[in-house]
Design a protein with these regions (language model features):
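Solvent-exposed interaction patches of small proteins and small membrane subunits
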Residues: 1-87
Length: 87
């Protein structure tokens, strides 16, 4: 993972950690369920954004490198598996 992408990923993970801790506190405080759910949706969106950043970085680096090295089939199999798992 490139340094800039890694820094962005780590920053977003810290944000997600903090957000989840906040959700935990809300549940412990018996906060209204709808308010807790809104925060869990925000966490999900943050994770989806994180996944997008990681995937874009992977496509720009590892996938390009794999194709240049002639590992087309392995790269495509890996991307197909990732798609299957992410569905």
């Amino acid at each position: 993972m490139l340094g800039e992408t890694k820094d962005d990923v780590l920053k977003r993970l810290r944000f997600i950690d903090g957000h989840i801790a906040g959700v935990r506190r809300m549940v412990e405080a018996d906060t209204y369920c709808v308010d807790v759910l809104k925060q869990t949706y925000a966490v999900r969106r943050a994770i989806e954004k994180l996944e997008g950043i990681m995937l874009a970085g992977h496509l720009r680096t590892c996938v390009v490198e794999g194709i240049r090295e002639g590992r087309d089939e392995a790269v495509l199999a890996e991307l197909s598996e990732l798609y299957r798992v992410g569905r």
